């Protein structure tokens, strides 16, 4: 509805968690790959720089203002590209106020601790 935009609640929560479940990590990655995204409710493919981790964090900063948010990662997207697991962790840490890992069981069962540590170091958390 036209009034939907008037009912935000960002000021009422301590921290917002978003799912930055993108395999394009930087704006450069997104522009190079020219990725299209199909969400569950889309009738056609979508494009926009917010469909990468860096772009999503920039857009959320714009929307949320001074309110904190953490970027979430979807670990199983990176089974075949462990380097990008480290990159997405680092990018989320650098550009947001925290990191949400979905789901820790993937890190445990696939022994991805080295990649997590590397991402946290590159992100400035270790």
What are these regions (language model features)?
Residues 2-9:
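Distinct, well-ordered alpha-helical segments
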């Amino acid at each position: 509805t036209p009034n939907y935009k008037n009912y935000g609640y960002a000021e009422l929560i301590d921290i917002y968690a978003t799912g930055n479940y993108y395999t394009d990590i930087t704006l450069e990655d997104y522009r190079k790959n020219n990725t299209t995204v199909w969400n569950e409710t889309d009738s056609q493919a979508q494009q926009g720089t917010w469909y990468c981790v860096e772009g999503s964090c920039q857009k959320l900063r714009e929307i949320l203002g001074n309110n904190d948010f953490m970027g979430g990662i979807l670990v199983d997207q990176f089974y075949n590209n462990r380097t990008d697991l480290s990159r997405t962790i680092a990018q989320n840490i650098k550009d947001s106020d925290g990191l949400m890992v979905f789901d820790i069981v993937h890190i445990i069962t696939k022994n991805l601790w080295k990649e997590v540590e590397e991402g946290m170091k590159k992100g400035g958390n270790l």
